[in-house]
């Protein structure tokens, strides 16, 4: 019902997902609501059923005319929002430097890490920085809080267009 509605950021970009809606839902054991959403979606898919969604209510877009570098910051499944922005920028071949910082408790929470590393390898203007709070000894990324990692890497953010 109406009281069961929850917001999920859309990860799909109009450039990459024509006719599809991609959501990133953190359905961990401690998040009963997210698990229920995932189970309801699975059941609807298996039974050729329907899921009712409410249209997006946000008003976010990339300032394409800006020549400033972009700083995309996300934690956990909040990555879906910056994923959509990154996809759009890559599809539009924006030349701005793009710095994407994505943080999670541990590496397994960075579920699209290899894909982002591939994107960064293909596009010289894309810089991906994974950040984990709990790192194994062989971890090559940053450790700690994602916002602290950004703070450590930049003296000032005044010259950036920031999406968080």
Curated annotation (Swiss-Prot):
Organism superkingdom: Bacteria
Enzyme Commission number(s) from the entry: 1.5.1.-
GO MF entries: oxidoreductase activity
One GO term (biological process): bioluminescence
Residues reported to bind pyridine: 75-79
Short name of one Pfam family: NAD_binding_1
Alphabetic keyword roster: FAD, Flavoprotein, Luminescence, Oxidoreductase
Function (record text): Involved in bioluminescence. It is a good supplier of reduced flavin mononucleotide (FMNH2) to the bioluminescence reaction. Preferably uses riboflavin as an electron acceptor when NADPH is used as an electron donor.
Family according to the record: Belongs to the Fre/LuxG FAD/NAD(P) flavoprotein oxidoreductase family.
Name recorded for this polypeptide: NAD(P)H-flavin reductase
